[in-house]
Design a protein with these regions (language model features):
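Active-site glycine- and acidic-residue-rich loops that bind
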Residues: 118, 123, 187-196
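Active-site beta-loop-alpha junctions enriched in small/polar residues
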Residues: 88-90, 121-123, 143-147, 184-186, ...
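Short, electropositive alpha-helical surface patch
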Residues: 99-102, 137-144, 191-208
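Auxiliary Fe-S-binding modules of radical SAM enzymes
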Residues: 1-13, 19-20, 193-275
Length: 275
């Protein structure tokens, strides 16, 4: 059966729109959807939100259709702060084209001119460039895990291609919207090839910074990763087992090497996320 026909899409009502964020640089989190159909094997959102539903993660999405109304009220009441859009979901996954929850939330934010930071691995963010560009304080982050689209298809089967994301970065630059790159999680044996060319393009389109993130083996991640590795790259299983049970020196060196490649490409601000 085609995945498009297996996806369960539901509408739900949220109790609140904004939650306090513990992420650096963010005051609030806004997640227009629950679940995500990008089906990234390394996703740790199910563990973060303590998901225990019957549906397989990646096969369902719930649209929080009342979020824009709730948000309009909360923006009037809460202290002003930076809103991180898409901290445990992708705000521009395919469901957004039908529901436009993210877009309608942006419309409310624009009225109050609150600062935002969007994170996505979808090129569909470019459809809202007209709205985003009207905000005085904004930033958009695009996620990458590899320069190789074949490897991307293994790990992120239903996300935008590498070339589509690069075009999105270029479109953001052309619109004058500050953009950064979230490179991660770093996947041993899969992340290294072609990075010089990838980072050179990112420097060319003036990304503000690159954040290099580590692979976090939250509950459920290894269970999704292992079958893919066993089928495609069984030689890499020991490296992932090592990361699963700690942070070995060679993995830390890999993170440092990737950060160094980004700096050598001309990106001045490069940070490796802490464990």
């Amino acid at each position: 059966m085609d995945k498009e026909h297996r996806i369960k899409v539901r509408e739900i009502s949220a109790r609140t729109a904004l939650s306090r964020s513990r992420l650096s640089g963010l005051d609030y989190a806004l997640n227009p959807y629950r679940g995500c159909i990008h089906a990234c094997l390394y996703c740790y959102s199910p563990a973060v939100i303590h998901y225990d539903g019957a549906d397989k993660w990646g096969d369902f999405v719930e649209a929080r259709t009342n979020l824009p109304v709730l948000l309009a009220h909360e923006l009037r009441k809460l202290p002003r702060g930076v809103i991180g859009i898409g901290t445990v979901t992708d705000p521009y996954q395919p469901a957004e084209r039908g529901y436009r929850v993210t877009r309608h939330c942006l419309e409310q934010i624009l009225r109050r001119q609150w600062p935002i930071c969007i994170q996505t691995k979808s090129a569909a963010v470019t459809e809202d460039i007209g709205l985003i560009s009207q905000l005085r304080e904004k930033e958009v982050g695009i996620t990458f895990t590899t320069a190789d689209d074949t490897l991307r298809a293994w790990m992120e089967p239903d996300a935008s291609t590498v070339s589509e994301r690069l075009k999105a970065l270029e479109a953001l630059k052309d619109a004058g919207i500050p953009a950064f790159v979230f490179f991660g999680p770093v996947l041993p044996g899969l992340a290294e090839e072609g990075l010089e060319r990838l980072f050179a393009f990112m420097a060319q389109v003036s990304v503000t910074r690159v954040l290099v993130d580590r692979l976090r083996m939250h509950p459920g991640v290894w269970e999704r990763l292992r079958p893919c590795l066993a089928a495609n790259r069984p030689d890499l299983l020991p490296a992932y087992e090592a990361v699963r049970f700690g942070s070995p020196e060679d993995y830390e060196q890999l993170l440092a090497d990737i950060a160094d490649k980004a700096r050598r490409a001309g990106i001045s601000s490069v940070v490796v996320e802490r464990p």
